[in-house]
Amino acid sequence: MTLFCEQVPYPRLAEAFGTPLYVYSQSALTEAFEHYQTAFAELSPLVCYAVKANGNLSIIKHFASLGSGFDIVSGGELARVLAAGGDAAKTIFSGVGKSEAEIEFALNAGVKCFNMESIPEIDRIQKVAARLGKTASVSLRVNPDVDAKTHPYISTGLKANKFGIAYADALEAYRHAAQQPNLKIIGIDCHIGSQLTDLSPLVEACERILILVDALAAEGIVLEHLDLGGGVGIVYQDEDVPDLGAYAQAVQKLIGTRRLKLILEPGRSLVGNAGALLTRVEFVKYGEEKNFVMVDAAMNDLMRPALYDAYHHIEAVEPKNIAPLTANIVGPICETGDFLGKDRTIACEEGDLLLIRSAGAYGASMASNYNARNRAAEVLVDGNEYRLIRRRETLEQQMANELACL
């Protein structure tokens, strides 16, 4: 049976736009966002989509139409939010290395809040705000030293990580921020990692942060919001992912009677399973020790398998009644690490379409031009309709900034 995205068969999309091709389901995006709104309804959260997961303008625009706020980590991401019609007043500026130019851009745009991550950043935002004659609304990202139990590259809440202000130093950092005339402290933030499959670290982080909220209140620093970041995982293979309803109930119980607005910053859990990467088999190569299915997608299109040894389910779009083989599914890039799946049993042959699932997050957003390969096109499907939301890059576009310098 042929695979479909909503009501559109994948072969139709391949014929119209070629491969490799990122394909997103609009209904899946909507359902994921509304799942957060429903689960946390009692707390009336501001759900801020983490743009780093997938910064396509049409995806940002769709979330904006649903009432989403946005979590950004660069001036470029802010520019994307604004270009797509997102609301700066519902945008949180996170990130460990904000430049003065980025801070100025964000202040002039009117972002809701800066999540500050160090004493030098506090001083820098004060300096820029004073120069502009503005007041910057700020919170501090506090590192609660909680083990997120995830891949070390995407764990962000331990003492050894570069993110946030150490828990033991947080009170003093808040005192320092409170002395700055052009800063208005409105919140506290934590984010302990990505692709979390266990609820307990999220709850533990919330508990530790609320202890700090109370200590700050005792010193007269009363906060308006609690930002718990993102991190909730999705199913790539057979993971047990946290139940949002249970998470919401735990957070509500912990907040209790405190008058705190809740902010959440999901990324992967909004877009990850809404997208897939469509690719075509170039060759099937049989070897003495290993077989290989060579496809036209590669690590420059989807970096996660090579970077994290991440698993993505891969299946034939139009299954055939032929003998399956066990093989590594690999791209044409000149790296041994250019693989999309290892030791997969699949029935396919030259020219067949394969679908790489759960590629909506950290797929296109991490793509590159390695080996001078053009970045893939992207398509958004809505029912039986579909539209191109990113044209396939051309070699002329890829070389434009260099040709001008010859």
UniProtKB/Swiss-Prot annotation:
GO term, biological process aspect, one: lysine biosynthetic process via diaminopimelate
Keywords recorded for this protein, A-Z: Amino-acid biosynthesis, Decarboxylase, Lyase, Lysine biosynthesis, Pyridoxal phosphate
A Pfam family: Orn_DAP_Arg_deC
Listed EC numbers: 4.1.1.20
InterPro entries to which the protein is assigned, alphabetical: Ala_racemase/Decarboxylase_C, DAP_deCOOHase_LysA, De-COase2_C, De-COase2_CS, De-COase2_N, Orn/DAP/Arg_de-COase, PLP-binding_barrel
Annotated positions binding substrate: R268, R304, Y308, E335, Y362
Residues bearing the modification N6-(pyridoxal phosphate)lysine: K52
HAMAP family tied to this protein: LysA (MF_02120)
Reported function: Specifically catalyzes the decarboxylation of meso-diaminopimelate (meso-DAP) to L-lysine.
Protein name: Diaminopimelate decarboxylase
Organism of provenance: Neisseria meningitidis serogroup A / serotype 4A (strain DSM 15465 / Z2491)
Source species taxonomy: Bacteria, Pseudomonadati, Pseudomonadota, Betaproteobacteria, Neisseriales
